[in-house]
Design a protein with these regions (language model features):
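Short active-site neighborhood of thiol/selenol oxidoreductases, capturing the structured segment around
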Residues: 2-30
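Residue-level structural signal for beta-strand termini and adjacent loop
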Residues: 3-5, 85, 117
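Extracellular/periplasmic catalytic domains that process cell-envelope and extracellular macromolecules
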Residues: 4-7, 39-40, 64-65, 96
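Structural microenvironment flanking redox-active thiols in thiol-disulfide oxidoreductases
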Residues: 23-72, 78-81
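Structural micro-motif
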Residues: 67-70, 85-91, 95-103
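Thiol-/selenol-based redox modules, centered on thioredoxin-like
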Residues: 94-135
């Protein structure tokens, strides 16, 4: 849960279309999980999908580059609705699925950066640059 990190870590949230968004979303999820800059004592990256957990357990078992990815399952879409990501430009399924959207939340729980990316590019370096402004 996001609240587990409150007061402890800066958090990157990556809302995405999940299993159907191959390869772009899978690649970003893997990059966030495998990039040591996002997995430190001060920071964590969480990928948020609306797919069922068992579906992703199967995907991760076959795609070892995803094993370090921290995945949150938003099957009810309550987090996606709360962060208002279901109707942004990057969503290919407006109203029902998030697209390719990032949030940086500081240790105090304040959203410090938001980026919706219809191009679905890998964003690690851009996110790190934004996170460095929090220090």
């Amino acid at each position: 849960k996001l609240s587990d990190y409150l007061g402890k870590k800066n958090v990157v949230l990556f809302f995405n279309e999940g299993s159907m968004c191959y390869p772009a979303c899978w690649n970003q999820m893997a990059e966030l999980g495998n990039d040591s800059r996002f997995n430190t004592e001060n920071m964590v990256a969480l990928s948020i999908v609306t797919d069922p957990k068992d579906q992703w357990l199967d995907i991760v078992s076959k795609s070892t580059n995803l094993t370090k990815s921290k995945i949150i399952f938003d099957t009810s879409r309550s987090a996606s609705k709360a962060y208002d990501v279901l109707n942004l430009n990057s969503s290919m399924h407006r109203g029902s699925l998030p697209g390719h959207t990032y949030f940086i939340i500081d240790k105090e729980g304040v959203i410090r950066f938001t980026m919706d990316d219809p191009n679905m590019a890998l964003a690690n370096d851009k996110l790190i640059k934004e996170i460095e402004t929090l220090k």
